[in-house]
Every structure is written in structure tokens, then in C-alpha cells.
Swiss-Prot record:
The keyword tRNA-binding is assigned to this record: no
Species assigned in the record: Mus musculus
Coiled-coil spans in chain: none
GO annotation, biological process: nucleocytoplasmic transport; positive regulation of erythrocyte differentiation; regulation of intracellular signal transduction
Name this protein carries in UniProt: Ankyrin repeat domain-containing protein 54
PANTHER family associated with the record: ANKYRIN REPEAT DOMAIN-CONTAINING PROTEIN 54, ANKYRIN REPEAT DOMAIN-CONTAINING PROTEIN 61
List of residues that carry N-acetylalanine: A2
Subunit structure: Interacts (via ankyrin repeat region) with LYN (via SH3-domain) in an activation-independent status of LYN. Forms a multiprotein complex with LYN and HCLS1. Interacts with TSN2, VAV1, DBNL and LASP1.
Length: 299
């Protein structure tokens, strides 16, 4: 019995097993660095195939190579990840989300701006523009505050809107610009203001009418009318001259513009109805001649 017990002790000391006849290899303790297990060292030991019975070193390195690569990564992968994210993307992520459209309060202010322009409410239009309302904001039919003001002939509101950045060439749902609407409603001062504000000088509407056509129509009405007072006729002729001056200046016709300057000076010196009618006739002749020249240029 003693011999048997001694044999067992010898087997345990030598590390041999009585069951399989092979050597039992004790696993190596994992190295520790600062209280943390170094998986990189463990991966290296596995990759080398040390301590694995019945497996060659080359075969072990081939089969466990992917584990070694994984375990040899940095201890703090979050820092590496953070470095790969572009700085601009981090700033955008930290920035609060921008609103995709106007708020309900802003929508109400924009509608109020268009309604006020349509109602000729100059004070409200001015206040809303000073508060930051967008003068180019349109309704569901594409109409802006400038469209309404131009159609109504309110030159003061038109000038306010232009001063705050309104687009004189913005089209509504039907393709009409503010200049189209001012021409259709025969508002000569508004046409002059829009031309000064950058409105295009090509055809006013789809019929191809220009300020020259409008001026001729207005002058024909003045020549046929006999009931208007002197000051009313003089004011209307003056407005037509200013419109044509601005229009011809935009076209680069400086000689014709000088002719209009002479007519304007002559109009200011009139004191009787006959003198005003004479200037009106001269202006009508000038307009007809300009229309003929314009027609010949298009051919």
C-alpha cells in the first residue's frame, strides 16, 4: 500500500497521468500590467503554438492568426474611433438641428404682410419688414406682397418692399411679374419705380406690350378727354415722361432720353390748358415714333 501511495506521489510530482500516459502541461499565468490582463501577450503565446500538444507551430500560427490580430488592438479603441470621425461632422452633430421651414408665427407674419400690402396699409407693411418679414415670400398662387402693391398702384409700398429686398422680377403662378400687373392696371408711377428697382425692360406681358404702348394709350385718353383740370393733366403727363425716361435709359437710348428731358422742362413752364395739350401732343408723337423704331429693330 505504501508503495502504491508512493507511486501516486511520484506521478503527481513528475506531472504524468496514470490514465493517458501523457504529460500534463500547466498553463502559464497571464501577464498583468497595471491590474489589466494583456490580451496581446496571450494572443502572441497562442499564435506561437506554445503549450498545445499534437499541433505544430506553423499550423497554430495559421489558424490563430486572426485572434492575434484582434488581441493586438489598442487598449482604448474608442479613442481610435473618435479620431477617425471628421471634426466637421462632430461639430454638426453637436449643433442643434435647424428648422426646415418657418414657424407658425412666421407664416402668420408673412400672410399679414401680403394682406397689408393688398389693403394699402403702409404702416403695417413697414413694421413687418422692420421685424424681418421676407418680402419675397409668396402664397400658394405664387403672389408676393410686391405683386399686390403693384396691382393696386401703391407706389409707396412698392418702394418699401424694394428697399427691403423684394424681387421685381419674381413671377407668380401664371408667370406675371409685378411689372406686368402694374402695366395691366395702368399704374405709371409704379412702373417707373419698378424699372428703377431693377425690373426687366423686355415685354411687359404676354402680348408684348412695353411702356411705350402704355404711354401711347394713356396719352390718347388725355387727348380725348376735356373734363380734366389742368393740374391733373399736367401730373399725368409728367408721370408718363418719367416712366419713358427710365425705360429708355435702361435700354441705353440716351438721345431719346434727352428729348424727354426737354419735354419735361417745357411741361413745367406751362400755365394754360392749351400749353399742356401741346406738350401732350408732342409726347404722343414722340411715343409713336419710338414704337415705330422699336418695331423696326425687331424685324
Amino acid at each position: 500500500m505504501a508503495a502504491t501511495g508512493g507511486g501516486a506521489d511520484d506521478e503527481s510530482r513528475s506531472g504524468r497521468s496514470s490514465s493517458d500516459g501523457e504529460c500534463a502541461v500547466a498553463p502559464e499565468p497571464l501577464a498583468e500590467a497595471g491590474g489589466l490582463v494583456s490580451f496581446a501577450d496571450f494572443g502572441v503565446s497562442l499564435g506561437s503554438g506554445a503549450g498545445l500538444p499534437g499541433r505544430s507551430v506553423g499550423r497554430a500560427q495559421s489558424s490563430l492568426r486572426y485572434l492575434q490580430v484582434l488581441w493586438q488592438q489598442d487598449v482604448e479603441p474608442r479613442d481610435e474611433l473618435r479620431c477617425k470621425i471628421p471634426a466637421g461632422r462632430l461639430r454638426r452633430a453637436a449643433r442643434p438641428h435647424r428648422r426646415l421651414g418657418p414657424t407658425g408665427k412666421e407664416v402668420h407674419a408673412l400672410k399679414r404682410l401680403r394682406d397689408s400690402a393688398n389693403a394699402n396699409d403702409v404702416e403695417t407693411v413697414q413694421q413687418l419688414l422692420e421685424d424681418g418679414a421676407d418680402p419675397c415670400a409668396a402664397d400658394d398662387k405664387g403672389r408676393t406682397a410686391l405683386h399686390f402693391a403693384s396691382c393696386n398702384g401703391n407706389d409707396q409700398i412698392v418702394q418699401l418692399l424694394l428697399d427691403h429686398g423684394a424681387d421685381p422680377n419674381q413671377q407668380d403662378g401664371l408667370g406675371n411679374t409685378p411689372l406686368h400687373l402694374a402695366a395691366c392696371t395702368n399704374h405709371v408711377p409704379v412702373i417707373t419705380t419698378l424699372l428703377r428697382g431693377g425690373a426687366r425692360v423686355d415685354a411687359l406681358d404676354r402680348a408684348g406690350r412695353t411702356p411705350l404702348h402704355l404711354a401711347k394709350s394713356k396719352l390718347n385718353i388725355l387727348q380725348e378727354g376735356h373734363s380734366q383740370c389742368l393740374e391733373a393733366v399736367r401730373l399725368e403727363v409728367k408721370q408718363i415722361i418719367h416712366m419713358l425716361r427710365e425705360y429708355l435709359e435702361r435700354l441705353g437710348r440716351h438721345e431719346q432720353r434727352e428729348r424727354l428731358d426737354d419735354l419735361c422742362t417745357r411741361l413745367q413752364m406751362t400755365s394754360t390748358k392749351e400749353q399742356v395739350d401741346e406738350v401732350t401732343d408732342l409726347l404722343a408723337s414722340f411715343t409713336s415714333l419710338s414704337l415705330q423704331m422699336q418695331s423696326m429693330e425687331k424685324r
